């Protein structure tokens, strides 16, 4: 079983590390090509392209310029410990045991605009390059064209290595669009998280993102290997709703706190 999650915009390169183990990203040659393109952008161009403030654009221009391919624990950090968004709040990788990291390294993948696919312990240098950004490059007009089949092929390699054919899609639509489902040698299961609001169940972005992290943690902590085991997920008040679920989509609901 291979779990897919999105990266985060917020990064943490200061907190104490729970493990010193690390691996290196497998697609760094591609990352270098994107950095080459990104370095051509001025801070105002970055601000427009990414729809971010001038201050953030300046920070990210500096990151592109400082980036270099020789990753070490001194200039980079393990991806699962560097990302700090809502998904990662639910995941809480900073509390993982070494055995948890072992399982995650085999079964969890982070999709990335710059790095393509990251394993949890892959070192990464700080960046911001969302998958949906229209960064022109030698392979096309955006990052989807740049990555083409590369991400899908890398996921197929991971599935083959564990002798499995199930992908748990906990990534956002923006990131999962970088995967070619028809070329993926797997059944795709998508958990959906609905929260009650004024008597109606709907996707509330903040809660849904955190729930994706909670589900990832649930799979890792319990060493789950079969999709039917996911229905036991009950973290923070969520419960499986079989009636709302369908082939390939597992629906989890949570009542409003009153």
Curated annotation (Swiss-Prot):
Gene: yaaA
Pfam families cross-referenced by the UniProt entry: H2O2_YaaD
A GO cellular-component term linked to this record: cytosol
NCBIfam families: PRK02101.1-1, PRK02101.1-3
Species assigned in the record: Escherichia coli O17:K52:H18 (strain UMN026 / ExPEC)
Similarity section: Belongs to the UPF0246 family.
Ranges in a coiled coil: none
Protein's recorded name: UPF0246 protein YaaA
Single GO BP term: response to hydroperoxide
InterPro entries in the cross-refs: YaaA (IPR005583)
């Amino acid at each position: 079983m291979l779990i897919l999650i999105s990266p985060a915009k917020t990064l943490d390169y200061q907190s104490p590390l729970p493990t010193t183990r690390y691996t290196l990203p497998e697609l760094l040659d591609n990352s270098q090509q994107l950095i080459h393109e990104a370095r051509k952008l001025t801070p105002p161009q970055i601000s427009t392209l990414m729809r971010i403030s001038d201050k953030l654009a300046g920070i990210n221009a500096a990151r592109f310029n400082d980036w270099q391919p020789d990753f070490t624990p001194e200039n980079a950090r393990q991806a699962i410990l560097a990302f700090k968004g809502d998904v990662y709040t639910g995941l809480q990788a900073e509390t993982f045991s070494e055995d948890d990291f072992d399982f995650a390294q085999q079964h969890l993948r982070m999709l990335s605009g710059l790095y393509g696919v990251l394993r949890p312990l892959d070192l990464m240098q700080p960046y911001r390059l969302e998958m949906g950004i229209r960064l022109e490059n030698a392979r096309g007009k955006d990052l989807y064209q740049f990555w083409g089949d590369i991400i899908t092929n890398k996921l197929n390699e991971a599935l083959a290595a564990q002798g499995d054919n199930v992908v748990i899609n906990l990534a956002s639509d923006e990131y999962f669009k970088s995967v070619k489902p028809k070329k993926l040698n797997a059944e795709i299961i998508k958990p959906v998280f609905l929260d009650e609001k004024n008597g109606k169940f709907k996707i509330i972005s903040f809660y849904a993102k955190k729930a994706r992290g909670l589900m990832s943690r649930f799979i890792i902590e319990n060493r789950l290997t079969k999709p039917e085991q996911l229905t036991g997920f009950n973290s923070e008040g969520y419960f499986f709703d079989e009636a709302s679920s369908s082939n390939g989509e597992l629906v989890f609901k949570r009542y409003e706190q009153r």
